[in-house]
Amino acid sequence: MELELAAKRLAELGHSTRLAIFRHLVRCGPSGCRVGDVQRILGIPASTLSHHIGRLVGVGLVEQQRDGRILYCLPRFDAFNETLAYLTEECCKGSYASDASCPPGPLRKKRSNTR
């Protein structure tokens, strides 16, 4: 992933309304949520919601699909996971800290003890 794309995605998620929208879509799961439901649940005016969704679509974090007259927003988990991986891929690589001081689990891969 390029630094510029990561920065753009993080900047868009840095806005409280867009972060609330994205978190709601993540809660809805891979099948997404109707735009009208997002508007009702989050209490965001339609024009404002459209603007913020457009920004998230623009950086690839959200996809829109139409089913007849109903518009759905789907979180792009692949793009979000790619962004998270970019943030954590260098975790503790330049550190002489013990494994105990590095974040556990998916934030870093286990170091090999082979030399």
Regions found by a protein language model. Give the residues of each.
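Amphipathic alpha-helical dimerization/coiled-coil segments
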Residues: M1-L5, R23-R27, F77-R115
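N-terminal helix-turn-helix DNA-binding core of bacterial DNA-binding proteins
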Residues: E4-P45, D67-F80
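A generic local structural motif
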Residues: K8, G58-V59
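Alpha-helical residues within the helix-turn-helix
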Residues: R40, V57-G58
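Intrinsic disorder/low-complexity segments
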Residues: I44-S47, K109
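Short, hydrophobic-biased segments on the C-terminal half of alpha helices
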Residues: I53-G54
